[in-house]
Structure formats: C-alpha cells, structure tokens
C-alpha cells in the first residue's frame, strides 16, 4: 500500500518531528472512491483512488523565506470527478490558439494557481503524466506514471514547484533557479533529505 504508507509517514514527520521548523496549514484526505470510471484514468491513479478519493496537504516554513515569501509546499490531488471534468477556462480557452491535445488534458495535482500536473486523456498517454504552466499552449512530459510521481512527491514533501526539478533532470536543462532552491533549502527544512537519494529515486521510477 505505497500510497497510504508514504502519506502516513509524511504526516507523522510534518505534524510531530518538524513542528518547530514548519507549520502544517492544511491536511485533508478523502475515503476510498470506487465509483470512478477506470478506463478513463491512468492505471496507477486508479490504484490511488482505491486508497484515497483526494489528498490535500500544505505546509509553510516558520522562518526560511526567499524574496520575502516563506518557503512552502503543497500537494493537491483532486477527486476523480474533478479530474475528469471540463477544464475549459482554466487549462485552455477556446478563443486562444493552442494545441488540440490541451483540450484533452486532465488536471490531477492542482498544486499552484499557475501550474498543475495531469494527463492527456487518450489511449496513447494513459499512465503518463504531463506538466503544464497555465497560459502555455502545450504540456511538458514528466516521464512518470502517477505511482512514480507520488513517490517523488512524498520525498520532495510537495516542495513548491518540485516538478520543475524533474523536468530539469529529464531534459538536462531548464528551471535552474528551482533546482538550486530545492537543493539548498530541502536539507535545511528536512535534515534527512539527500539530493543524491532523490536523483536515485527518479532514475528508479522514471519511464524508460
């Protein structure tokens, strides 16, 4: 039960062991959901919904900040019914030019007001997650199943824009500022975090 075990571990760590370093501003999870349509969702996401129907977790560093903003993290895995809903007006706009695949994009982790992670709802892309900055006309492949994404998300503790670190690892470039902040501040907030372990986990779970 990788989904439940990893979340319980994260919850215990943030709520107890690190209470002097961070504050948990939101923790919410739903009971299992067995009413979703399996053939419309990635396989490993279906496995998640048999454990939780949704998962929301926000934390904020008590002292550490960058450019006047406290360091924080967010996990926001949506309910299946929300994922499969209509994302016009959020992900894409009819009157703005975009790739046709954007209209098939379904948001899974709505971790920021300006960005998210999801999948393109056609047979070719099932169990393969994509990153999207709102306002962009196409997505960026993460090269991860939802299960692999979840494992990395838990190790990253939902650190703000940790997904861009994955894009940098996958492409060998881009988002250098996000990578630098991640490497500097993660060990300061979470003493057991090691960059080398994160990279090793990425290499293990990425789609090859």
Model-assigned labels for residue ranges:
Residues 102, 124-127:
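A short, compositionally biased
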Residues 1-115, 204-208:
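A surface-exposed partner-binding patch
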Residues 169-208:
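Charge-dense, low-complexity intrinsically disordered regions
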Residues 20-29, 62, 159-170, 199:
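Short glycine-rich, low-complexity/disordered patches
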Residues 115-122:
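Short, surface-exposed beta-strand/loop micro-motifs that present aromatic residues
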